[in-house]
């Protein structure tokens, strides 16, 4: 049986990440990754086309070497910036008894895309909430059911500004690969939540380099999403100003000594930094450093609370899930736990080689790709035999972990701080993960699911450009 590999690209403000993965039982097996740091992206968008393109190209090459896969087609993750989330429905009719298949599902979903009448936006994701067969039978997956009259879908829709979409896809396809489809972070975050969290109402907070993204899920579905232009870079700027040192030095000490919860920071960890206006070096403690970090991270969380209040939310019973590169900072969980009465957890992907919060978007893009391929019946998944341990595989389906319930006292400002120390996952500089599988074996066995069709489907970019000029 053919092996089907999924390649995702995450274009972030500080780095570009690529993951090559495959479906493995109910999870994803990571074959290889690549990561390249870049200055060509600002606030999650293309700032310098040439620099960004080179970073994407380098990252694809690293992932290709690590996995032994010749990468030709990719799935692209898009940021929440410039997006709108809303609900829509569509219905198709049948004039005889019909067994529903993936083509019918694709048709009814495509009808929702065609209903978008805002010229400056493009619908990028339509995620089914429920299907209704013959106006009465509500189901989550109608494949193989017999419909006598109709198939209706009630779905959530994510649309993005066309200029953002075009430039992101153009930059990726300039690297010699085709973008098969795109997935918004707003939708992707659903794969990092447990079923209980999604049902009760959970808030995902992705703190990146330039942007903090927020998505709220409730009753199993995405409710809304937004972004805040305040994130890790602002933390570093505050450190540089507070310690009177360079940005580069501030970034270094943030990663080595940073702590986001003042009461748990140490006054015994001492470091020295050079001053920007003299040749002198000055000593500081981790507690001194934490004073600047805590203030900014706290401000980011208050901005998140404002977003939730704008949505009319007074409870987040499923808790807060923090991820993204800045979630690596020690004390982030402790600080947020001190500000809210609901549970807080840091999300880190479970697979070997990507066990860092900054890989959450890239791996969840693969989860989204697999979910839609299975819904539309595009692929028959090969469940590989493997010696990999369970901890190396992240669930594609929602996990039914028990979440902490309890009253939600809205968002508390800081009161009595705890003295407990929360060890977060530390970031490393690893750029390439190479699996134990032999590279040559992957090259010989690899054949992408779309490559078997001689009449290859046009890329997302080519389709979009055609539509603009029709």
From Swiss-Prot:
It is a peripheral membrane protein. Self-interacts. Interacts with FtsZ. GO terms for cellular component: cell division site; cytoplasmic side of plasma membrane. Gene3D superfamilies: 3.30.1490.110, 3.30.420.40. This is Cell division protein FtsA. Cell division protein that is involved in the assembly of the Z ring. May serve as a membrane anchor for the Z ring. It comes from Staphylococcus aureus (strain MW2). InterPro entries: ATPase_NBD, Cell_div_FtsA, FtsA/MreB, SHS2_FtsA.
């Amino acid at each position: 049986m053919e092996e089907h590999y999924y390649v995702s690209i995450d274009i972030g403000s500080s780095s570009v990440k690529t993951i090559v993965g495959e479906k493995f039982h109910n999870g994803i097996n990571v074959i290889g990754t690549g990561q390249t740091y870049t200055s060509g992206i600002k606030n999650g968008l293309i700032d310098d086309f040439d620099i960004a393109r080179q970073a994407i190209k380098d990252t694809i090459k690293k992932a290709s070497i690590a996995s032994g896969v010749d990468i030709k087609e990719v799935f692209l993750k898009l940021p929440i910036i410039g997006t709108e989330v809303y609900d829509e429905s569509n219905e198709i009719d049948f004039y005889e008894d019909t067994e529903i298949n993936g083509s019918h599902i694709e048709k009814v979903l495509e009808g929702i895309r065609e209903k978008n009448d805002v010229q400056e936006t493009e619908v990028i994701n339509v995620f089914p909430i429920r299907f209704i067969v013959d106006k009465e039978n509500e189901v989550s997956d109608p494949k193989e059911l017999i419909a006598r009259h109709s198939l209706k879908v009630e779905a959530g829709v994510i649309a993005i500004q066309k200029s953002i979409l075009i430039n992101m896809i153009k930059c990726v396809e300039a690297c010699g690969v085709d973008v098969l489809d795109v997935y918004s972070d707003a939708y992707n975050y659903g794969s990092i939540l447990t079923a209980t969290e999604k049902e009760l109402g959970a808030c995902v907070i992705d703190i990146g380099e330039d942007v903090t993204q927020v998505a709220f899920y409730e009753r199993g579905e995405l409710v809304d999403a937004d972004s805040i232009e305040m994130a890790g870079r602002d933390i570093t700027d505050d450190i540089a100003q507070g310690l009177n040192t360079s940005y580069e030095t501030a970034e270094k000490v943030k990663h080595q000594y940073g702590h986001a919860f003042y009461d748990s920071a140490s006054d015994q960890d001492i470091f020295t930094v050079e001053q920007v206006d003299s040749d002198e070096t000055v000593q500081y403690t981790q507690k001194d450093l934490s004073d600047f970090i805590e203030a900014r991270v706290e401000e980011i969380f208050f901005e998140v609370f404002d977003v939730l209040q704008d949505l009319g939310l007074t409870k987040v019973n499923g808790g807060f899930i923090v991820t993204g590169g800045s979630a690596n900072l020690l004390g982030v969980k402790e600080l947020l736990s001190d500000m809210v009465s609901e549970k807080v957890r840091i999300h880190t992907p479970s697979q070997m080689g990507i066990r860092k919060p900054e890989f959450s978007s890239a791996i969840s893009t693969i989860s989204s790709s697999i979910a839609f391929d299975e819904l539309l019946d595009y692929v028959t998944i090969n469940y590989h035999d493997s010696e990999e341990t369970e901890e190396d595989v992240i669930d594609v389906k929602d996990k039914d972990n028990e979440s902490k319930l309890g009253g939600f006292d809205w968002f508390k400002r800081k009161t009595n701080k705890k003295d407990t120390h929360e060890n977060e996952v530390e970031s490393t500089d690893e750029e390439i993960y190479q699996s134990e599988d032999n590279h040559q074996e992957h090259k010989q066995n690899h054949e992408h699911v779309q490559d078997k069709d001689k009449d290859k489907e046009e890329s997302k970019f080519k389709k979009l450009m055609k539509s603009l000029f029709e």
